[in-house]
From Swiss-Prot:
Glycosylation sites: 30, 64, 150, 170, 237, 308, 337, 496, 522, 535
Family designation: Belongs to the influenza viruses hemagglutinin family.
Lipidation (S-palmitoyl cysteine): 570, 573
Ranges that cross the membrane: 543-563
SUPFAM superfamilies found in the cross-reference section: Influenza hemagglutinin (stalk), Viral protein domain
HAMAP family: INFV_HEMA
Organism: Influenza B virus (strain B/Maryland/1959)
Disulfide pairings: 9-488, 65-77, 99-148, 495-499
UniProt superkingdom: Viruses
PTM field: Palmitoylated.
Full protein name: Hemagglutinin
Subunit structure: Homotrimer of disulfide-linked HA1-HA2.
Length: 574
């Protein structure tokens, strides 16, 4: 056989590989490309959540008013609360009301603005829930105070409560009295009813109520009952933010009445009876933040503010977030987006013991810039390289599938967190930080493992792609080439760049490249001389010679073995 044949091999690209990915079983692996899955955000201002109504202050048009002012119905802070799916808890320190001094620490009243923020739709009723003047223990005069001025700077009081001061002939001590609080909101709305009581020093208690002893109060709604006893005297003169200083104090609380449910208030003298009530429906997610809200963002994060999502995950400081947010992970994650790094392949010059060409060393092919997998030919023309775009696209599709799977995992975890947020207690709408951190650690570990397994699968699938290419190449070449191992074939014709490109495109025709211009193989058939021997005789000679040689070798090996064990001695005489 005489040949000027070329060699065609399947292979994977070889290029600089500065990237490293982590896998489940192989540890860190160098690859030709990666897709970063994480980002580390920087702090920014808070923003409106894209595509979502975002509420900053409860009443944006109520100037110089705190959310507590709005929640209690301070006369100068009456306005419309806009609907919102997201609310910003922007008041980070205990907030007072610019009205009559309140004993905030006696009740859960500080939570009232938070409670209202947790609703999508909030409105103040147009009518009073109780006629305060004719309530049990009356008749009453509805009291006002100069420390709580109205819009004309006259004396006023909170719109949500009526200060029930007994009329002159009725200023006497009384046993506990009961008033029912009816449900007056529209079906489907929660009713938030604000009430309270006033106390002062002994002298003023007698003047106002005809009784200087501590008074008892109880509220009950939805199976929750709360008891209070008023404190008499001992208060320094003060006001909340403005107005006249007061020696007295008020204690304010609220009850939440579910649709159709009636509440109950048991009271003595100094009661602040409910008046206008809050009617609220829907859910609004609450997150701690700051004002003003500038622009829009995909995500609102308690630590980083408004974020625009560029990666599915983030590293850095973990905190609560709402919106289309990346999920927190402990370490940076990268998905393999290429092939495992291989050094440039080299052709073995040596032949094996039986004369077969061993093929190419394991490695990658340089110059395969149009794809990851493909073919290379070596011959007089030099080196030709062609990428198999179909195989490369299949590999890319696998990576895309892995990326989509990771995104689905992200969405499921996000929905899990979102579901937890929706189930929070109405009053505070916050997760316990320790539980939240534990959940975040667990999710981070799940995501990290998913990425490790994805990288493992992407890298391991390279062998599948190469095997598929080898089968494809073998089928196309057919009898025009001889398989020599390691994905390589020795052709019976020349295969330059044009030939290789057609192989990569799947349009190769062996007959076209077997023309004389390609220096096809010149094979001279061996002939048998007619010496009067037939084929059977020739085969007999060959088999006899081979058998004799085998027997001779076996005897020689046996003698050498026996001599080495001193079982046979050999003397040579001259």
């Amino acid at each position: 056989v005489t040949s000027n044949a070329d060699r065609i091999c399947t292979g994977i690209t070889s290029s600089n590989s500065p990237h490293v990915v982590k896998t489940a079983t192989q540890g860190e692996v160098n690859v030709t490309g990666v897709i970063p899955l994480t980002t580390t955000p920087t702090k920014s201002h808070f923003a409106n959540l894209k595509g979502t109504q975002t509420r900053g202050k409860l009443c944006p048009n109520c100037l110089n008013c705190t959310d507590m002012d709005v929640a209690l119905g301070r006369p100068k802070c009456m306005g419309t609360i806009p609907s919102a799916k997201v609310s910003i808890l922007h008041e980070v320190k205990p907030v007072t009301s610019g009205c009559f001094p309140i004993m905030h620490d006696r009740t859960k009243i500080r939570q009232l603005p938070n409670l209202l923020r947790g609703y999508e739709n909030i409105r103040l009723s147009t009518r009073n829930v109780i006629n305060a003047e004719t309530a049990p223990g009356g008749p009453y005069t509805v009291g006002t105070s100069g420390s709580c001025p109205n819009v004309t700077n006259g004396k006023g009081f909170f719109e949500t409560m009526a200060w029930a001061v007994p009329k002159n002939k009725n200023k006497t001590a009384t046993n506990p009295l009961t008033v029912e609080v009816p449900y007056i909101c529209t079906k489907g709305e929660d009713q938030i009813t604000v009430w309270g009581f006033h106390s002062d020093d002994e002298t003023l208690m007698v003047i106002l109520y005809g009784d200087s002893k501590p008074q008892k109060f109880t509220s009950s709604a939805n199976g929750v009952t709360t008891h209070y006893v008023s404190q008499i005297g001992g208060f320094p003169n003060q006001t909340e933010d403005e107005g006249l200083k007061q020696s007295g104090r008020i204690v304010v609380d609220y009850i939440v009445q579910k649709p159709g449910k009636t509440g109950t208030i048991v009271y003595q003298r100094g009661v602040l009876l409910p008046q206008k009530v809050w009617c609220a429906s829907g859910r609004s997610k609450v997150i701690k933040g700051s004002l003003p809200l500038i622009g829009e963002a995909d995500c609102l994060h308690e630590k980083y503010g408004g974020l625009n999502k560029s990666k599915p995950y983030y590293t850095g400081e973990h905190a609560k977030a709402i919106g289309n947010c990346p999920i927190w992970v402990k370490t940076p994650l990268k998905l393999a987006n290429g092939t495992k790094y291989r050094p440039p392949a080299k052709l073995l010059k040596e032949r094996g013991f039986f004369g077969a060409i061993a093929g190419f060393l394991e490695g990658g092919w340089e110059g395969m810039i149009a794809g990851w997998h493909g073919y290379t030919s070596h011959g007089a023309h030099g080196v030709a390289v062609a990428a198999d775009l179909k195989s490369t696209q299949e590999a890319i599709n696998k990576i895309t599938k892995n990326l989509n799977s990771l995104s689905e995992l992200e969405v499921k975890n996000l929905q899990r967190l979102s579901g937890a947020m929706d189930e929070l207690h109405n009053e505070i709408l916050e997760l316990d930080e320790k539980v939240d951190d534990l959940r975040a650690d667990t999710i981070s570990s799940q995501i990290e493992l998913a990425v490790l397994l994805s990288n493992e699968g992407i890298i391991n699938s390279e062998d599948e792609h190469l095997l598929a290419l080898e089968r494809k190449l073998k089928k196309m070449l057919g009898p025009s080439a001889v398989e020599i191992g390691n994905g390589c074939f020795e052709t019976k014709h020349k295969c330059n760049q044009t030939c290789l490109d057609r192989i990569a495109a799947g349009t190769f025709n062996a007959g076209e490249f077997s023309l004389p211009t390609f220096d096809s193989l010149n094979i001279t058939a061996a002939s048998l001389n007619d010496d009067g021997l037939d084929n059977h005789t020739i085969l007999l000679y060959y088999s006899t010679a081979a058998s004799s040689l085998a027997v001779t070798l076996m005897i020689a090996i046996f003698i050498v073995y026996m001599v080495s064990r001193d079982n046979v001695s050999c003397s040579i005489c001259l």
